[in-house]
UniProtKB/Swiss-Prot annotation:
Main location: plastid
CDD domains per the UniProt record, alphabetical: Ribosomal_L20
Record's protein name: Large ribosomal subunit protein bL20c
UniProt function note: Binds directly to 23S ribosomal RNA and is necessary for the in vitro assembly process of the 50S ribosomal subunit. It is not involved in the protein synthesizing functions of that subunit.
Parts of the chain that traverse the membrane: none
Gene name in the database record: rpl20
Gene Ontology CC: chloroplast; ribonucleoprotein complex; ribosome
Length: 117
């Protein structure tokens, strides 16, 4: 059986991995084995954090809506607002409500007052 010289294929594979890890620090961008490990770790973190990002943004929107709603009336909260929105079948998601709360508070106050009636 003849010896297979796989220099070009292996070099191409390694350079592709090196390009991915070129911005990493220290041995993580120089040594092939650690580059491979760090690439796997980076991709796992990216996959995990895409789900976390959705969670974090939803928490941010809820916090913003709650802060603005509590300023308007004494005994009104986020949970009551969302409950009343569902009762009235108004299709406003949390992202849109948070944008309204930041950009135009009076509009959110009008929405909440109309729902209460």
């Amino acid at each position: 059986m003849t010896r297979i010289r796989r220099g070009y294929i292996a070099r191409r594979r390694r350079t592709k991995i090196r390009l991915f890890a070129s911005s990493f620090r220290g041995a993580h961008s120089r040594l092939t084995r650690t580059i491979i490990q760090q690439k796997i770790r980076a991709l796992v973190s990216a996959h995990r954090d895409r789900d976390r990002q959705k969670r974090n943004f939803r928490r941010l929107w809820v916090t913003r809506i709650n802060a603005v709603i509590r300023e308007s009336t004494v005994s009104y909260s986020y949970s009551r607002l969302i409950n009343n929105l569902y009762k009235r079948q108004l299709l406003l998601n949390r992202k849109i409500l948070a944008q309204i709360a930041i950009l135009n508070r009076n509009c959110l106050y009008m929405i909440s007052n109309d729902i209460l009636k």
